[in-house]
Swiss-Prot record:
Keyword vocabulary terms for this entry: Ribonucleoprotein, Ribosomal protein
Protein name (database record): Large ribosomal subunit protein bL35
InterPro entries for the chain: Ribosomal_bL35 (IPR001706), Ribosomal_bL35-like (IPR021137), Ribosomal_bL35_CS (IPR018265), Ribosomal_bL35_sf (IPR037229)
UniProt cross-references to HAMAP family, sorted A to Z: Ribosomal_bL35
Length: 66
């Protein structure tokens, strides 16, 4: 049976912590930031840990990165 392929879109957007949790950058900061509040801009910086349900889906896309 051939090896499974990693989804290219997933490997560009997600990374794993040492404990196996999935990290991602929050959405909503590409454009239109002038009309956003300062609190919103501050809250969407950095990375966040995905929920268990979302992490399960992402792990299927990246079979060899854990």
């Amino acid at each position: 049976m051939p090896k499974m392929k990693t989804k290219s879109a997933a490997k560009k957007r997600f990374s794993f912590t040492a404990t196996g949790k999935v990290k991602a950058g929050p959405a909503g900061k590409r454009h239109g930031m002038i009309k956003r509040s300062t609190k919103f801009i501050r809250d969407v910086t950095g990375t966040m840990i995905l929920s268990d349900a979302d992490a399960k889906i992402v792990k299927k896309y990246m079979p060899y990165d854990r």
